[in-house]
Curated annotation (Swiss-Prot):
<dbReference type="GO" id="GO:0003735">
    <property type="term" value="F:structural constituent of ribosome"/>
</dbReference>
<protein>
    <recommendedName>
        <fullName>Small ribosomal subunit protein uS2</fullName>
    </recommendedName>
</protein>
<keyword id="KW-0689">Ribosomal protein</keyword>
<dbReference type="InterPro" id="IPR005706">
    <property type="entry name" value="Ribosomal_uS2_bac/mit/plastid"/>
</dbReference>
<dbReference type="GO" id="GO:0022627">
    <property type="term" value="C:cytosolic small ribosomal subunit"/>
</dbReference>
<comment type="similarity">
    <text>Belongs to the universal ribosomal protein uS2 family.</text>
</comment>
<dbReference type="InterPro" id="IPR018130">
    <property type="entry name" value="Ribosomal_uS2_CS"/>
</dbReference>
<dbReference type="Pfam" id="PF00318">
    <property type="entry name" value="Ribosomal_S2"/>
</dbReference>
<keyword id="KW-0687">Ribonucleoprotein</keyword>
<dbReference type="InterPro" id="IPR001865">
    <property type="entry name" value="Ribosomal_uS2"/>
</dbReference>
<dbReference type="InterPro" id="IPR023591">
    <property type="entry name" value="Ribosomal_uS2_flav_dom_sf"/>
</dbReference>
<dbReference type="GO" id="GO:0006412">
    <property type="term" value="P:translation"/>
</dbReference>
């Protein structure tokens, strides 16, 4: 049984790229056609590459590798957090702080500060501090939790990263390249496939597209760590009832068109 069907990809709008004038020519191999000035991603290739990514991720998870999900754009932030937590991974979904990986020792010091402040809060010790001091410390705690909360259990550098919106997360990509950390990334039509190790051509703006693909990657991690599809199914009910996302258009109308091979070119 395939990891994902063409119908699922179509219904989630995975095939919609950017306007043709905003493309990266290096993505031409993954582009099927153009419609009304918008590039359409070749979903046959996307489906195959998701299969390959799934097998790769499952194998790495089975070997005990640790994953970091990165995506700070509004559409992806909640999904990044949800799927990272579901698969027992780390995440950054608010802002990428320069040196988060390449200057890990310094960042780890800030993470320890976060844990220290959390302990003060949870133990009730902050309530015993002067009101002004407690207010300052709580503001510091809130800021650290916002930016570092997703990596507070990360004891060392991740073995692999999963990225949504390569262009927005370019600084993170550069840090991973410097450190030799493999990159799994959704690639919209304005991205550069040469910058990643495991490409997944896909719409990285639509919530349903991001949710579908990150969900599959998360499934692969769970299956790899816990040994089989049953482990994934154990989590599906909670996952389906989690965060609600705004509804997007119904893309199933494109299914017949895609299957027929008709295009504007």
């Amino acid at each position: 049984m395939p990891v994902v069907s063409l119908a699922e990809l179509l219904e989630s709008g995975v095939h919609f790229g950017h306007q043709t004038r905003r493309w990266n020519p290096k993505m031409s191999q993954y582009i099927y056609t153009a419609r009304n000035g918008v590039h359409i991603i070749d979903l046959v290739q996307t489906a195959q590459l998701i299969e390959e990514a799934y097998e790769f991720v499952r194998g790495e998870a089975d070997r005990g590798k640790r994953f970091l999900f990165i995506g700070t754009k509004r559409q992806a932030a909640a999904i990044i957090k949800q799927e990272a937590l579901r698969s027992g991974s780390h995440f950054v979904n608010q802002r990428w702080l320069g040196g988060m990986l390449t200057n890990w020792e310094t960042i780890r010091g800030r993470v320890e500060r976060l844990k220290e402040l959390e302990e003060l809060e949870n133990s009730g010790a902050l309530d015993k501090r002067p009101k002004k001091e407690a207010s300052v410390l709580r503001r510091e705690l809130g800021k650290l939790e916002k930016y570092l909360g997703g990596i507070k259990t990360m004891r060392r550098l991740p073995d692999l990263v999963v990225v949504v919106d390569q262009r927005r997360e370019y600084n993170a990509i550069q840090e991973c390249q410097k450190l030799g950390i493999p990159i799994i990334s959704l690639l919209d039509t304005n991205c550069d496939p040469d910058l990643v190790d495991v490409p997944i051509p896909a719409n990285d703006d639509a919530i349903r597209s991001v949710k579908l693909i990150l969900g599959k990657i998360s499934d692969a991690i769970i299956e790899g760590r816990r040994g089989g599809q049953a482990a994934v199914e154990e989590y599906e009910e909670d996952y389906d009832n989690e965060t609600e996302y705004e509804e997007e258009g119904d893309y199933s109308q494109y299914a017949a068109e895609f299957a027929s091979g008709d295009d504007d070119n």
